[in-house]
Amino acid sequence: MGVMWGLISVAIASLAQLSLGFAMMRLPSIAHPLAFISGLGALNAATLALFAGLAGYLVSVFCWHKTLHTLALSKAYALLSLSYVLVWVASMLLPGLQGAFSLKAMLGVLCIMAGVMLIFLPARS
């Protein structure tokens, strides 16, 4: 049950990260606080994405709380790294997120996935 809650948390956190990335690329820079605050006042896709991303993180924390009640931290923490994989792949596939493929990034993703698989392999008896 803990793995399920962990995977749900990772999926929601990944969607939240993508949503926040979408919002930040479209809202005015925080370096210009008045323009940024004004941009938040406008009800548009960027503002909705920002608040959806923040809400997503909140829901993800609830799921993570459930995860840690039933799964060892050493295993649960490994699940978090899957978010990097999901966000990397989605940023390349979804339009407007400016993700770029590189062999170096692909090697990193493969290392993450191999590490998660090693952690979740059953122990020898």
Swiss-Prot record:
It comes from the Bacteria. This is Probable 4-amino-4-deoxy-L-arabinose-phosphoundecaprenol flippase subunit ArnF. Residues 1-2, 55-76, 122-125 are cytoplasmic. Gene3D superfamilies: 1.10.3730.20. Heterodimer of ArnE and ArnF. The chain crosses the membrane at residues 3-23, 34-54, 77-97, 101-121. One of its GO terms (molecular function) is carbohydrate derivative transmembrane transporter activity. It is found in: Cell inner membrane. GO terms for cellular component: plasma membrane. Translocates 4-amino-4-deoxy-L-arabinose-phosphoundecaprenol (alpha-L-Ara4N-phosphoundecaprenol) from the cytoplasmic to the periplasmic side of the inner membrane. GO terms for biological process: lipid A biosynthetic process; lipopolysaccharide biosynthetic process. It comes from Salmonella heidelberg (strain SL476). InterPro entries: Flippase_ArnF (IPR022832), Small_drug/metabolite_transptr (IPR000390). Pathway: Bacterial outer membrane biogenesis; lipopolysaccharide biosynthesis.
